[in-house]
Amino acid sequence: MNLKKIIKLADGSLLTPDIDIDIEINGGYGADLMSDVLAFSQPDSVLITGLTNPQVVRTAQMAEFRAIIFVRGKQPQPETLVVAMQENIPLISSPFGMFELSGRLHKAGLPSFESNESD
């Protein structure tokens, strides 16, 4: 699914306008525990989270996420924006909570990219 469509479905605000959003996202993963993100996510997906610190972007980069959506209208810390620009990872803010947003995206056809296997 194209990130532009995801932003529309999320009623999202793009926080990194200088980063290209004409990219394909293959699935979604929602979590606030970054150790779970590293252990159970799959590459080329969108991370849905309530955390807004710079570590979220660093974790997303390590796990090969293509974009990050902050839930409940949260805004990232200024340093988070800087790291996202350096790593070329689009940041989006959505007014929906994690459960609602995940459901909307899944209903629209975005598959879950949560692995059921632990290391």
Predicted regions and their residues:
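Absolute protein N-terminus
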Residues: M1-N2
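N-terminal intrinsically disordered, cationic/polar leader segments
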Residues: I7-K8
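Short secondary-structure junctions
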Residues: G12-D18, S112
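Compositionally biased, intrinsically disordered low-complexity regions
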Residues: L14, Y29-D32
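Histidine/lysine/aspartate-rich catalytic loop segments that bind and position anionic ligands
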Residues: I19, N26
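Feature captures the catalytic cores and cofactor-binding loops of soluble hydro-lyases/lyases
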Residues: D22-I23, A31-V46, L51-D119
